[in-house]
């Protein structure tokens, strides 16, 4: 189900963070209400009303060993925010196409140092949206599941190698018709950094494959304008912070 365009909103956010639980564990609880406040251009473009949205989350953070961490997140999305979980949209944005619905997401991610020079990172995601109705009249449900893992070897404090793998599977029902797509990504990268943390300069090669033949949007049909189901990418990526 479509998840754009985004519209302006006024927001109220409540957050209680870093509540200690047991050794190395903290809990955060948050709620955000988004009041639709579309500008003139957005109102003209849509020619319909907009509904407010709301999101809530619970985050359990667990420290593992000295430098490892694991995060478990449960999220709820209501009304205009109903599709944000399945589209990996930000909780502070409001989807102007949604009239009704609700969604939820369960996510787990973290990094564990398994040896002096080896780290393993992971991310598990499942999200669903139910009883969704769009302003264009479409009705249905959607879900997404994904898993990814990254193994890092530190050759020194200034250089490291990454091996990353990921897989996703999306499903949706629109007006009684079922659709699905899936895909995978594999990446090998070599990074130079100032110390073991970012910033870093990364040279990478990635292979993507995806099966989107049974999907609704022809513009999203795999690669090379829909002619191929896989592709390669080579590039340079910089991660910096101040």
Spans of model-derived segments:
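Internal, well-ordered domain-core segments that constitute the primary functional module
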Residues: 1-17
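Residues that flank catalytic or metal-binding motifs in active/ligand-binding sites
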Residues: 8-12, 54, 186, 234
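C-terminal structured domain segments
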Residues: 177-224
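Detector for outer-membrane/organellar transmembrane beta-barrel domains
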Residues: 17-19, 23-36, 41, 45-175, ...
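A broad, low-specificity signal marking well-ordered, structured residues that form hydrophobic/aromatic
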Residues: 14, 70, 188, 201, ...
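Outer-membrane beta-barrel "beta-signal"
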Residues: 225-242
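Residues in well-ordered beta-strands of folded domains
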Residues: 15-17, 30, 204, 239
């Amino acid at each position: 189900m479509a998840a754009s365009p985004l519209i302006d909103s006024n927001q109220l956010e409540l957050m209680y963070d870093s509540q200690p639980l047991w050794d190395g564990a903290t809990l955060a609880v948050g709620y955000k209400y988004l009041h639709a406040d579309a500008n003139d251009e957005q109102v003209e473009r849509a020619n319909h009303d907009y509904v407010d949205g709301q999101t809530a989350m619970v985050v359990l953070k667990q420290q593992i060993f000295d430098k490892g961490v694991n995060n478990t997140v449960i999220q709820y999305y209501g009304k205009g925010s109903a599709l944000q979980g399945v589209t990996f949209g930000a909780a502070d944005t409001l989807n102007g196409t949604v009239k009704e619905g609700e969604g939820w997401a369960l996510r787990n991610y973290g990094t564990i140092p398994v040896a002096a020079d080896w780290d393993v990172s992971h991310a598990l995601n499942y999200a669903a949206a139910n009883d969704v109705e769009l302003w264009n009249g479409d009705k249905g449900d959607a879900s997404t599941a994904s898993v990814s893992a990254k193994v890092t070897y530190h050759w020194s404090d200034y250089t490291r190698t990454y091996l990353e793998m990921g897989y996703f599977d999306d499903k949706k029902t629109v007006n009684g018709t079922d659709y699905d797509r899936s895909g995978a990504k594999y990446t090998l990268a070599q990074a130079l950094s100032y110390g073991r943390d970012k910033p870093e300069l990364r040279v990478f090669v990635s292979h993507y494959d995806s099966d989107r033949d049974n999907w609704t949007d022809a513009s999203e049909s795999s690669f090379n304008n829909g002619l191929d189901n896989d592709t390669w990418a080579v590039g340079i990526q910089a991660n910096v912070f101040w």
